[in-house]
Swiss-Prot record:
Chain spans, region Disordered: 34-83, 263-291
Modified positions (Phosphoserine) in chain numbering: S247, S273
Protein name: Translocon-associated protein subunit alpha
Source organism per UniProt: Pongo abelii
Residues with the Phosphothreonine modification: T260
Gene Ontology CC terms, in alphabetical order: endoplasmic reticulum membrane
TM region(s), chain numbering: 208-228
Main location: endoplasmic reticulum
Annotated gene: SSR1
Length: 291
């Protein structure tokens, strides 16, 4: 009876151990199998990714080639190595607004075939993006044949708009020509950023109007002052001038001393006495003759 509990305890200890020993290798095999299957799936996914990358790498060269071909097809024509161009601005590289800018373009044919110069054009563009046009000038048709080892000079002029004064713009001047085989070329004779200068000389409409307004205002002021002076002259009263007495009898001589008056009267008598002497003599003669 005492051994029975001990045996049961041993059985309880031994039975799980036997189960573990029996199931251990199988379990490890299952785990190993699961691991190998996972590794295979990982390897398959890696291989698939590598295949995709290889396909992408194979596709990239074709895409680049296509892009290059599109650029070649859509790109603008370039200058011919058998031709050379020069430019000369007649009045210097100053671009006054609302004034004529004139320049000369020289073309030299260094090749062995004729070149046909078709046109010459110019345009103002946005400085940060030359694809954006600000002012496009009229193209000058030339249609001039330049033989080999010969030169030709072309004249072109344009007028920058007045609102563009004081701002920088990209000036692009293109010379378009082709050879006898029909190959088209374009040479950017001038491609730089320039500043349009505000014109200071001369008179514009606003200045002329201001001068006319000031002249009219000055004329009105002069006319107003003249009218004011005339009105003041008319309102002035006529001052009466005293002429004095015309007759000597109206003169008051009471304030003169009597001696002075006697002298004055005597002088008057002396002045008047010679006129009366002939009469007295005539009277005396008449009296003597009567006697």
């Amino acid at each position: 009876m005492r051994l029975l509990p001990r045996l049961l305890l041993l059985l309880l200890l031994v039975f799980p151990a036997t189960v573990l020993f029996r199931g251990g290798p199988r379990g490890s095999l299952a785990v190993a199998q699961d691991l190998t299957e996972d590794e295979e799936t990982v390897e398959d996914s890696i291989i698939e990714d590598e295949d995709d990358e290889a396909e992408v790498e194979e596709d990239e060269p074709t895409d680049l080639v296509e892009d290059k071909e599109e650029e070649d097809v859509s790109g603008e024509p370039e200058a011919s190595p058998s031709a050379d161009t020069t430019i000369l601005f007649v009045k210097g590289e100053d671009f006054p607004a609302n004034n004529i800018v004139k320049f000369l373009v020289g073309f030299t044919n260094k090749g062995t075939e004729d070149f046909i110069v078709e046109s010459l054009d110019a345009s103002f563009r946005y400085p940060q993006d030359y694809q954006f046009y600000i002012q496009n000038f009229t193209a000058l048709p030339l249609n001039t044949v330049v033989p080999p080892q010969r030169q030709a000079t072309f004249e072109y002029s344009f007028i920058p708009a007045e609102p563009m004064g004081g701002r920088p713009f990209g000036l692009v001047i293109n010379l378009n020509y082709k050879d006898l085989n029909g190959n088209v070329f374009q040479d950017a004779v001038f491609n730089q950023t320039v500043t349009v200068i505000e014109r200071e000389d001369g008179l514009d409409g606003e200045t002329i109007f201001m001068y006319m307004f000031l002249a009219g205002l000055g004329l009105l002021v002069i006319v107003g002052l003249h009218q004011l002076l005339e009105s003041r002259k008319r309102k002035r009263p006529v001052q009466k001038v005293e002429m004095g007495t015309s007759s000597q009898n109206d003169v008051d001589m009471s304030w003169i001393p009597q001696e002075t008056l006697n002298q004055i009267m005597q002088s008057r008598r002396d002045k008047a006495s010679p006129r009366r002497l002939p009469r007295k003599r005539a009277q005396k003669r008449s009296v003597g003759s009567d006697e």
